[in-house]
Amino acid sequence: MSGECMLHIRLFSTNLYIRSTLLRSVSDPNTLLHYCSMSANKRKLKRQRESPDSGGGKQPRLAEGRARESGWLLREVNELRRAAQGCEVNKKRLRYLSDTQKIKQGSDGFLYWMSRDQRVQDNWALIYAQQLALAEKLPLHICFCLVPRYLDATYRQYAFMLKGLQEVAKECKSLDIQFHLLSGEPGQNLPSFVEKWKFGAVVTDFNPLRIPLQWIETVKKHLPADVPFIQVDAHNVVPCWEASGKLEYGARTIRGKITKLLPEFLTEIPLVDTHPHSASRAAEPVDWEEVLSSLEVERSVGEVDWAQPGTSGGMNMLESFIDQRLRLFATHRNNPNYDALSHLSPWIHTGQLSAQRVVKQVKREKNASESVASFIEELVVRRELADNFCFYNPSYDNISGAYDWAKKTLQDHAKDSRQYLYTKEQLENAKTHDQLWNAAQRQLVSEGKMHGFLRMYWAKKILEWTASPEEALSIAIYLNDRLSLDGCDPNGYVGCMWSICGIHDQGWAERPIFGKIRFMNYAGCKRKFDVAQFERKYTAVKENSNKDSKKSSSKN
């Protein structure tokens, strides 16, 4: 990015921040202007009222009187994007997968093969593809290859993804970018599609997982030799291959590397604007209802009502996080009874929301520095550590991928007596003796998510209640991939591997079944939060579900 471009963005950002701060000071009772006019007694009462610990465990009051109206975030972001227009993509963010790097002459356009990053704006891969197309004065196309089934993903995840893609297609139309939905494996369809449309280059996303890597290799093998094939990491703030060239042992070994590179990569993201070069041929229209009905996936796991698919839904959730929950994150993120989390993982997983955009906007909040630091540790360091693990460890989802000490201790205790043994079906249906575990599982079933603290407890109990570590890991991954909106993701695999196999952790005091793997139990959870309150909430979920089932049966 040029120095002139950076200076322009900084000046614009400073102006925008000053303007928003002045607006806030007029009507926000939490600002210094208002605060100084309050009496000492009022200030004392205000501190007591807003203290997270003052409510006897109740949800703390959120900031009141914010000057920002609904939709402020999108308006602010659009201004920032436009101010960054013309800024180049950092070349370290991309790599050529083909032997040739020369753009094929006599082409009819450029193709961005969208896969992991399913959004138009804040997408470095699409930005780079558009910059190539602009340089050659050619049309820009986007395609997405829809496989009818993927691992243990269900209708829940597919519907969320496809409704987000429908939003992508609509935005593409408004920008004069052609959107194509191809059906089937990329390796079978993409190379011939490229030849048919005479594309001069193909740009695609980065994904460290096994099947997407196989797709890349197959496409690379069958693409015309004179068509450049370029991969751009638009999912990570620091590109995976730049953060580290090897498998990192844990957060402490990668944190410094990522932090050192953030100033280079955590830049403002330019706008994807209307493309000035129209295609002579239009993409085939997509019948989205037909696409949804043609899926070969399990449909008993339905959609959830709390998560609006698409980038617009993700931006709305980000806005609510910044306004309502961010300041609670540092102190209350490990308490499942508090609404202190971002809830952004479904949109970040599907790429409907850019992690870099999230970081940029959260960092602008100057009154929640502790929470901002904690959140960036989770969103950047821990999440990108998960990509590192999956990219450099082919056995990221099985016991073979564990550290030697962990494999040995699990093997040493594999035959230990278990007080309880449950089948996969019993676990999926929350039929255990542990009401906290059952409540967490019901949350996953009903909401497509589970509180982060309970994910650890949940997976560790599966290790304790199944016949072997291999079976425990298999069931944990199956349930997460099947039920969670952010399933089939590096974060999910690493979360299960951390809980069951000690990945990115150390050995602890040896005990039955777990060996030296970190132990968690019910009593420990009771010391952390009001377990009974959480259990009551999801017992009610079970009762409501049973009532709905009875009503449905009576109607039939």
Curated annotation (Swiss-Prot):
Q: Induced by what?
A: By visible light.
Arranged from A to Z, the UniProt key words for this protein are:
Chromophore, DNA damage, DNA repair, DNA-binding, FAD, Flavoprotein, Lyase
Q: What is the top-level taxon of the source organism?
A: Eukaryota
What are the GO MF terms of this UniProt record?
A: deoxyribodipyrimidine photo-lyase activity; DNA binding
Residue ranges of the region described as Disordered: 43-65
Q: Which enzyme type, at the first EC level?
A: lyase
* Details of cofactor binding: Binds 1 FAD per subunit.
Bilayer-crossing regions: none
The answer, when asked if Ligase is one of the entry's keywords, is no
Binding residue positions for DNA: 333
* SUPFAM superfamilies assigned to the protein according to its UniProt record, in alphabetical order: Cryptochrome/photolyase FAD-binding domain, Cryptochrome/photolyase, N-terminal domain
Q: What is this protein called?
A: Deoxyribodipyrimidine photo-lyase
Its gene?
phr
